[in-house]
Amino acid sequence: MGDITDLLSKVSIDDVYDEWEDQASGSLPEDAEIENVYKTLNVKIKVIGCGGGGSNTVNRLYDDALKNADLIAINTDASHLRSIKVKHKLLIGQKTTKGLGTGADPKVGEEAAIEEIVAIKKIVQNTDITFVTAGLGGGTGTGCAPVIARAAKEAGSIVISVVTLPFESEGPLRMDNAVIGLEKLAQFSDTLVAIPNQKLLSEVPNAEMKVAFAYADKVLADTIRSIVEIITKTGIINIDYSDIKTVMQSGGVALIGMGQSKKGGDRIMTALEEALKPRLIDVDVSTAKDCVFKIIAPPDITVSEVGKAMDEIKKKINPRSRIIWGLTIDKDLDKDVKVLIFMTGVSSAYLVKDVESARKAGEHVHRIICGRDRHGELDQPMIRENIFFNLIITT
């Protein structure tokens, strides 16, 4: 038995990959038919940036050459929208705002979106997954994001909303706007990623304000990119879209993690530890009920390394958790390994303590975090399956 284990530990995925490539290069009579079916099965993903912050996020994704997703920017500010590089842009509220923005009034942002609802419905149709991203607290993003999420939901799309909450220095009015917008957005989101900008300051404590905002854009973009790559990157072991769909709709608090090894050392464990490390908010992954993770590695990744990562994840989460995993070979990675993780059912004290302390008049936030049950009563602080949305805490 030991001899077999020793042998397997030396087997490179490269050997499997070469054989797989040889088979893939074949020209069987059924290949054309399979290819035609495959093209119809591709997951259609759109990322819609709402307002200035959301538009900046899709601009960053454009600069980073995100693949397998259409990028769209929507804003009331014609000048800012003009500076965004993405191909698809929509200026909303030409009658309401005349292209000059909303004056930080979410109601005006909402009216501007409703004014262009026909165009918005065309954008979100025939889409499997719609990302709605915005910096909450201002007028356009806060007001129009829920309108867009609702249109996408009604069109049959899974809706993943990825937003930031304001820095404390931006004042109480923007926080008031943000939490009201968050509550509206939650009603039409299958998954809601809420990133408190104040927590980002621990990452860039002495940065200028513009640098802090740019870092917030990066965190949003990295979060979206990780989910897109989990869904779309094909490989030796693929993650089925239907599994992802089930997890996204399964309810509960969730965590998204991403990690990449550096040169030398135990690369698979380095990447995994980085993916599981909570940089913004402390979470307990031992309660996770679903875990989706993808390893993206060079061809020399070994069976032993993959098994080691699997064993480590099993140690950290609930033994009854469902684990869905995939492996993609990327020759451009040289010797590095990337790990992407998505877990649902994790828990965090942040949900009831830190959010409320960040917002002195915390009734709105408390109601969002706890949700309400079918009878309209305030639910317990831990989010359960009957709550109307998922809150994702990002690492």
Curated annotation (Swiss-Prot):
This protein's record includes keyword Nucleotide-binding: yes
SUPFAM superfamilies: Tubulin C-terminal domain-like (SSF55307), Tubulin nucleotide-binding domain-like (SSF52490)
Main location: cytoplasm
GO cellular component, one term: cell division site
GO annotation, biological process: FtsZ-dependent cytokinesis; protein polymerization
Gene3D superfamilies: Tubulin/FtsZ, GTPase domain
Coiled-coil ranges (or none): none
SMART domains linked: Tubulin, Tubulin_C
Domain of life where this protein originates: Archaea
Binding-site positions, GTP: G52, G53, G54, S55, N56, G139, T140, G141, E170, R174, D217
Keywords: Cell cycle, Cell division, Cytoplasm, GTP-binding, Nucleotide-binding, Septation
Residue pairs linked by disulfide bridges in the UniProt entry: none
Stored Pfam families: FtsZ_C, Tubulin
Phosphoprotein recorded as keyword: no
An example Gene Ontology molecular-function term: GTP binding
InterPro entries from the UniProt entry: Cell_div_FtsZ, Cell_div_FtsZ_CS, FtsZ/CetZ, FtsZ_C, Tub_FtsZ_C, Tubulin/FtsZ_2-layer-sand-dom, Tubulin/FtsZ_GTPase_sf, Tubulin_FtsZ_GTPase
CDD domains (alphabetical): FtsZ_type1
Cellular localisation: Cytoplasm
Function, as annotated: Essential cell division protein that forms a contractile ring structure (Z ring) at the future cell division site. The regulation of the ring assembly controls the timing and the location of cell division. One of the functions of the FtsZ ring is to recruit other cell division proteins to the septum to produce a new cell wall between the dividing cells. Binds GTP and shows GTPase activity.
Subunit architecture: Homodimer. Polymerizes to form a dynamic ring structure in a strictly GTP-dependent manner. Interacts directly with several other division proteins.
Family: Belongs to the FtsZ family.
PANTHER family linked to this entry: CELL DIVISION PROTEIN FTSZ-RELATED, MITOCHONDRIAL DIVISION PROTEIN FSZA
The name this protein goes by in its record: Cell division protein FtsZ
Species: Thermoplasma acidophilum (strain ATCC 25905 / DSM 1728 / JCM 9062 / NBRC 15155 / AMRC-C165)
Taxonomic placement: Archaea, Methanobacteriati, Thermoplasmatota, Thermoplasmata, Thermoplasmatales
Gene of this entry: ftsZ
